Amino acid sequence: MGKLEKNVFVIWITTFTTMLGVGFIAPIMAIYAQTLGATNLEIGLIFGSFALARTVAQIPVGVLSDIYGKKFFIVCGTFFYGVSTLMYNFVSTVLGFLIVRIFTGIFSAFVTPVAGSYIAAIAPKTRLGEYMGIFNSAITLGFGIGPFIGGILADMYGIKMPFYFCGFLGILAAIISYMKLEDIVFNKNKEKIDVKKISTLFSFEFLKNRNFSSSFIINVSNVMINAGIYAYLALYAINYNITISQVGFMIALTNILMALLQRSFGKLYDKLGNIMIIIGIFIISFGMYLLSTSTTFLTILASLTIIAVGSSISSTATTSLAVKDIPTHRKGEAMGLFTTSINIGMFIGAVSFGFLADILGIANMYKFSAIFSIVVGIISYLRIER
């Protein structure tokens, strides 16, 4: 195994291990918050605080990782994410839970954006799509199978056990990256960093780049669609006598499918280029329309499978396009900003599509999502520089 492959493998293992832990606690967060006396509004604040903290932190973290090295932030992020996750088991109030949630959001910003920029920096430019597909598969696969394992742990050993396992996996990921990962630093003259340079930590100048901004908007749209699916799929499926365990199976299966497909679609992007983005968007929209008309386990599963294929195509292509023309020494900053599209999409999608579901019903909300995806996708695609 060469040096490039070794570093990619270490990043993949570190990211997968961390996201596996995140998946462990995903099914039980709301239940655990309720045992502390949290209302539905407070549960919403708890979930939202993670995305908000992550969004605020990941842009400056991306810039600082370019200056001071990727390894430091990946090691610190995974370690303190693990430690802060362990603290869930020792909180006794909703406020304490909220504070811990904020810290886990901050430290999660040290991991995936920095790891993604690490891959973008070391990957050969002609194989960027392939390597970003490999990286994205670690996120999707880890979070895909994590909820199943976390649910089993909670049923067998109590609701606190997944938090212990998640914390352990975070610390394990820190140890792996500390021992095996090679550091990369782009600015070794740290003493020359001045106030003007620090002021660029929150720079949004990348959004002036049409390719970056188009990728950003498309990714927000795609994540909004996925947020609408995952937030309301169980409510939709229960109307057709589909059990929660079957819903969990469908989500896990589609996530694993996405993980398996992303590298191959990354290679296709390297060959075919930006046309892959619009192909993925049309497939997503077709799957969303089918989902809105599905009334059985098999038809819903088929719809989600189609959406997963489209998402695999589109997500790998948009991520690759976003960082393709960014200077190597600023890919961390760009990746940090680009990854905020995930948090923005999750928040806006869950809230806005929930509002529409109350007015139109969940099935019609899914139909609206299909139209929304196509309209936003086409407009953004036409803005991409040829």
UniProtKB/Swiss-Prot annotation:
SUPFAM superfamilies: MFS general substrate transporter. CDD domains: MFS_MdtG_SLC18_like (cd17325). The keyword Cell membrane applies. GO terms for molecular function: transmembrane transporter activity. It is a multi-pass membrane protein. The chain crosses the membrane at residues 8-28, 43-63, 79-99, 102-122, 134-154, 156-176, 216-236, 241-261, 272-292, 297-317, 342-362, 365-385. GO terms for cellular component: plasma membrane. InterPro entries: MFS, MFS_dom, MFS_MdtG_subfamily, MFS_trans_sf, Tet-R_TetA/multi-R_MdtG-like. It comes from the Archaea. It holds the Pfam family MFS_1. It is found in: Cell membrane. Keywords: Cell membrane, Membrane, Transmembrane, Transmembrane helix, Transport. Belongs to the major facilitator superfamily. This is Uncharacterized MFS-type transporter MJ1560. It comes from Methanocaldococcus jannaschii (strain ATCC 43067 / DSM 2661 / JAL-1 / JCM 10045 / NBRC 100440) (Methanococcus jannaschii).
